[in-house]
Amino acid sequence: MHRSINSILPWNLLFFVSALVLLGCATAQYTTRTNNLSASPSPAATIAQEESGAINRPTSKPYAGELSIFEDPKRDEKLQPNRIMDILGVKQGSNVADIGAGSGWFTVRAARRVGNGGIVYAVDINREYLDYIEKRSKRERLINIRVILGKEDDPLLPQKGVDALLLLKTYHEIAQPIRLLKRTRAAMNAEALLGIIDRNGKGDDHGVDKEVVIKEAERAGFMLVNQYDFVKPDNVDYFLVFRAAR
């Protein structure tokens, strides 16, 4: 004959075992709720992220190699700098910013166009590149170039002092693009235009999808006014033009 467990175990031991089972269930439910809460950012964390301009995507390591790659004779044909400057409204007397200036490829071309009545700010976070641009400007007798050692999130441009800005194949390297764009906007005159030339990519492959750039620029207070594909027309490179939203 089989006897039930109630007849085998004392009632107080049964009570103890039951209590342990209930405690285990409650602990499991609490752990699950805690894990679910930790998986989702708190409202405060989300607000802090928005205010800081943080992004959640990969970026490329800033280029720090030889500058000769920027001086390919075919680059003018591919990128059409004069057409870029026409679109951005660069003319005699304009103040222009070349953010991520590198070898100064665009800097010197803009300096020739704006003449001695204008200024071209060559901004880079690499001191060696700026030294190269200073030597180049002296060699080419361009007295209207000013070099600026910027920060990763701030080009350190003069407030309301720029008529046109260009980020040429630089945006995919910027770790805090929204913060940098906000500080760039502060340097722009009322009618100034910002041009961003880059290539479609994943962020860490020296490219970033243009739709990502547009959304981040909008978060920073810009509005898209036009886009072009004449810079290396290969369905990869793009040229976006923004102005500060009013």
Label each PLM-derived region with a short phrase.
Residues 111-112, 178-193:
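A short glycine-rich, Lys/Arg-flanked "PGG" loop and its adjoining helix->strand segment in the class I
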Residues 140-153:
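Conserved SAM-binding strand-loop segment of SAM-dependent methyltransferases
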Residues 224, 229-246:
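Core SAM-dependent methyltransferase catalytic element
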Residues 126:
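Conserved SAM/SAH-binding beta-strand->alpha-helix loop
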Residues 163-177:
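A short SAM/SAH-binding and catalytic strip from SAM-dependent methyltransferases
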Residues 104-108:
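Glycine-rich SAM-binding Motif I of class I
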Residues 30-97:
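Class I SAM-dependent transferase core
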Residues 155-165:
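A short acidic, Gly/Pro-enriched loop at the edge of an enzyme's catalytic core
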